[in-house]
From Swiss-Prot:
Classification of source organism: Eukaryota, Fungi, Dikarya, Ascomycota, Saccharomycotina
Protein name: Serine/threonine-protein kinase KIC1
Region (Disordered): 308-347, 615-760, 787-831, 901-956
Keyword Kinase: yes
EC number: 2.7.11.1
Protein's organism: Saccharomyces cerevisiae (strain ATCC 204508 / S288c)
Amino acid sequence: MTTKPQNSKQGLAEGEMDVSSLFKRTEVIGRGKFGVVYKGYNVKTGRVYAIKVLNLDSDSDEVEDVQREIQFLASLKQISNITRYYGSYLKDTSLWIIMEHCAGGSLRSLLRPGKIDEKYIGVIMRELLVALKCIHKDNVIHRDIKAANVLITNEGNVKLCDFGVAAQVNQTSLRRQTMAGTPYWMAPEVIMEGVYYDTKVDIWSLGITTYEIATGNPPYCDVEALRAMQLIIKSKPPRLEDRSYSTSLKEFIALCLDEDPKERLSADDLLKSKFIRAHKATPTSILKELISRYLLFRDKNKNKYKIEGSIPENEPSKPSEAPKPSQNGGGDEAQKSIASNDNEIKRVNEGDVEMKWDFDSLSSSDYIIENNINLDALAEDNNEWATAQHDLFNYAYPDEDSYYFDPTSHNTRPFVYQGTTIGKGYPGTIAQNSTLNAPVTNNYTNSKYPSKMVAGTTNTSGTHTAGPMTSSKRLESKAPKQLLELFEDNEIITAENDVNTEAPKISKSISSLNAGNSSRDDFIPSISNEVNGNINNNKMRPHLPPLSSGNNYYSQSTPALPLLQTKFNKTSKGPPTSGLTTAPTSIEIEIPEELPNSALPTPASADPVLIPSTKARSSTVTAGTPSSSSSIQYKSPSNVPRRLTVSNNRPEHCPSTITNQKLGSAVASNSGISSTPNNSNNYNNNTDSENSRGSSGSNTANSTQMGITNPGNVTKLSTHKASSPSRPLFGVGTSPNRKPAGSPTQNIGHNSTHTNLAPPPTMKPMANSKDNKDILLQPLNSIPSSSTLNTISGNSSNNLTSSNYFSNEKEGSRVNGDFKRNNPNLKLQMPLPTPVVRNKLLDPNTATSQNNNGMPGSAGISTNENINQFGFNTSSASNIPVSMTPISEKHIDFGGKIKRSQSISNRKNSSASEHPLNILGSSVSGNVSGIGNNNVGSNNNSGPNNSVPLSANTGNTTIKANSTTIATSSSAAASTTAPISQQTIPSGTQFNHILSSAATAANSVNSLGFGMCPPPQSLQMEMFLDLESFLPGKQRRVDRKPQVLKELENLLQMFEEGLPCIEHALKEQLISTPIKDNEH
C-alpha cells in the first residue's frame, strides 16, 4: 500500500479538500513546539502516519518557522535517516503536516532504563552522521540536534527529525549569524553575538548529544539556560573523564567538541574516525534491543509514572477524548473522535514543549516475540542511574514529568508535579527529574556548607549536611531549583547567590572579557583556606563534581589567578584542589595597593629548626604543599600584561634544616673587618625585614625578621606573619652554566618532573660542613675568633676556605657544578618604596654622625658593622618600613665579556639573563672591599669620597684601601682587568692578599667610571591610594596603577644600571687561591 506523496505546494493547494476525510487521528503521541502530534492513518490505504497539527493563530515569526520546516522537509524527503515528509494540508487556521511515523520513539525515551552500551551509541552516531553528511552538502544546518530529536523506528532505523529551526545557507554567504536551537546543545559560535557560523555547529551539537547518551544529560543541565550559555562560551569544552568509557568514544566526543570550528571535523571526516569505524559493520537492527529493554522497563514501572503518550492531567491538551488504537487501524471509533479532536487543537498549549514521540502503544511481549529479541542480551536496568537523581533538577528538559524516583520502591519523599505547586509546601520537597537515571554519586560536604538548598513556600530554605567530604567523578550535585520559583513569595535561590553562603567563588571580573581590570578585592587571602577548605579552584571540566555544593561554575577560558598562602608552618587543609592554584611557572608580581610595612619584632623562637624561615618569591604565589597540589598547569591570561619578575624560582630546591650558623647572606652587611682584639661573634647584620611584594593583588605584607646572634653558636630566628621571600640558592642538581629564562614577557618553563609544588624551602645556614666554606661567603665583620685572620684559616671548626675549589687545577676558575651548591647565599639587596617621612637612616648626615669618619668600615667602630651599601643601619631597620628584596638567579660566565643590560623599555629582565657575570643571580652586597657608597644623596657624577681605612689586622699587615663611590653610568665600560680564570695567584697567598686585591679592584672600578645611583629619598604616598579629594568632603576613585608602575620601573631601572659595576667588582674580587690541604 502506497500513498501519493504531496509536497507543500500541492498540500496547500489541495487544502480545499476536507483533510479529515483523508486522514483520521487515533491518539496523541506528543506535543511539539507549535502544536500537537497525533498518530493517524490514511482512510483509503490504512497506512499509519504522524500528523503534526499546527495552530497558525500565533505570531508571524512562528508561522515563518512552520513554513521553513515544511520547505526543508520537502527538499530533504529523499535523504535517508531523516523523517520523511509526505505533504501538508490547511484546514481553517490549522496546518496538518503528514510525516513518517517512527513507532520506536525518541532516543531520549530509550535512555530511561539506564545506561546503554557503546555498541548502540556507535550505530546511532553512524546513522546520524550519514544524515548530516547529506544535509550539509545541501548547505542546510539543522541547528537543533539532541537526543529528543532523534527517533528510532520499530525496525531500529535512526531518523533525525524536527527541522523547525533549520537554516538554509545561501551560496553567497556560507555562514549564518542568528541564534537558534536549544541552549544546552548550542555551539559557542552560535551563542556569541556577531559571530558567523556554518554547518560545523551541527557537529558540536552531535558531540553534546553523544555526551548526553553516554552520561544521561547534557553538560550544565543543572543550571538555567542563560547561565549555561555563559558557561559554554567561557569554559573549556566538556570531556568524558570516567574510566568506564572507551578511549575511542572519548576521542570522538573530543573531535566533535573542538572550540575552533575550523579544526572541528566534518561529518564525512567523523565517519572515518576510530569510534565509528569500530561499529561500521553493526546493523541497525541491534537497536531493537533498546526498544525491547524500554518496553520491559515500562511494564515493570507502570505504577510509578504516567505513560508518556498521555498528556498530564493539568495540561489543557488532555487526551481524554483521544481514541485508543484499534485493531482495524481506525474505524468508527476514530470517526467519532474527529469533532472532539478538532476542539482539542484549538486548546493546544502554545508553550515551547519538547517533542515526545510515543511508542507505548507497542506490546512488550508481542514486540519481543515478533522481532526475536534475546532477553539475555538485554542490559539490565541500571539502578545506579536513579540513585541521587532526586536532588537534581534538569533544566535541559524542564517539562519532563516526574515519573519515579528509582526503579525500586524505596522512595521516602513526596512527588513534585511539574506545572503545579503540589508538594511544594514541604521544606524537604525536591524538584524531581527522573527521565534519566544518570549515574551520579552523592557529594557530601562538611557541616559548614549545605549540600542541598530547597526553596519551599514557608520562606525558608531547608538544608541537608552530611558527614565527611567525598567527591564524585561523574556528574555534579547541584542545589536544585523549582520550575515555578518566579511565582513564589520566598527569596529565589539563583545560581549566583546560592553559592555565596557556602564558599567563595572566582571573581566575575576574571573573565575573558575583562581579565585585565581585575580588582584586588576579588581575591581571597589564603587564611580563608583554613576556613573554606573545600573551595574548588580547578574545575577543568564542566561535568566533574565540585567539592562544595551549589552551582559554582566559573569560566575557564581565563585561568584564575592564584590565591596567596601566608601560613606555611601549617599544613594546608581542604581537598587537593583547595584555595591554591599551583603553577609550574613564575607569576607576574602585582603592585600592592598599600605600602607594606614590616611588623614589630617578635620574640625569637626557642626551636628555630621547627620554623621554615624563608621561601622563594615565586612560592608566595605558586606555593603548594603535597596535600594541596594539583595537576593543573597554569596558563597566564593572554590579555594581562606581564610585569617584570624579580624571581626565577627553580623547583628542584629542597628545604633544609637550620643549623647553628649565620644564614648565608654572604657579605650582606656593609661592615668592615674590625681588628679589635675583643671583637665578639655577636652580630645582627642583614636584618631581613623583607616585605614580599603583594602578588596577585593581595594586600598582605609578608614580612620576616631574622635577627641572628651567635654568642655560643646558638641561632635564634624571629619570624612574623610569613616567611621572607629571600631566594635560597641550594644548587642541588643544578648547573651553573644554565641560563634561566628571565624574559618578563614569557613564562619560565620547567621540566615536567619539576613543579613548584613543594613547601617553600628553608634558608640553609652556613653550617660546619665542609661544603660551605668559601671565604667570600663569610661575613667580614663576624670572624668567629678574636685572633688574626691567619689563625682563622687554621681553625678546623670554622674553615673559611675549601680545598674543594683550589686543589684541582681544572676547578681553578670555579665554573663548575659545585660552586652553585656550595655558595647558595650570595644576594643583592635593593630598597622598596619608602614612606613620605624622610627616615633618618636614609640621611647621609645622620648616618655619618653614627660613625667616626662618616663611612662604614672604620676600624674599631662596632656600630659601623650594620651599615649596608645603601646606607641603611640594618641593626635598627626592623622597626622601619624599609625592605630588602633579593634578585633572581644569574648565569655564571667569568671569562665572557661584560655586557650592558638592555633598556627597561624592552621589558627584558637583565637580572636573569643579560648579565652573564653575575654569580647565581646574587651579588655580594656587602662592602667587602670597602667600597663606600654611603652618600645616598650624592649625584651620579660624585667624585671620590672620604678615605675609608679598611683595617684587616692580620698580625703583621694593615691594609688601607682608598675607596670611592660607585656612580651609575648610562653605559658600562669594558673591563681592562684580566678575567679571574686568567689570573695566577701563588699558592701561599693568604686572606689579606685577597682583601688587598679586592680593594685594588674597587679602585679600578672607579677608574673605569662605574657608578651607582643613590636610592630615592622619598616617594609620594598618595599613589597607593585610589581615592582623592576633589571637593571638600567628597572623594572620587582615581586609577593610580600607571603611577605605581612608573615608580616601580624607576626602581628596577636603578637596580639594572647598578648591576654592571657590581658584576665588575665581583669579577675582581672572586680570585681562585690554591691552598694546600694542610693549610685550611
